[in-house]
């Protein structure tokens, strides 16, 4: 039987690798998805772990010097649906299925959604940084 401490030890090792590798938008998005999805695979509860997962998953994004990925409240159901679809497709963690992030290609829908949510923030930051004509 797998216990949370053992799984979290594996998660921390994977997180540290992806944290170090997050240097641009593409690698930061992949680090975000890997950290977030694997965390909720270990802790699939409706007790606030989604908020914790999103906060922790944004650490590599921030480390790369980028603004955080924010799930808009109106997209929350889509976000939860995609997480559950992934979990349903790859199965729960067990002795036979202990990989934290199996079949990453199954994250394509969530990747597309996260990228679209993030693009809004990236555009706001770019707009704030652009020079303005003073009237």
Which sequence ranges carry the predicted segments?
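FIC/Doc superfamily catalytic core
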Residues: 1-135
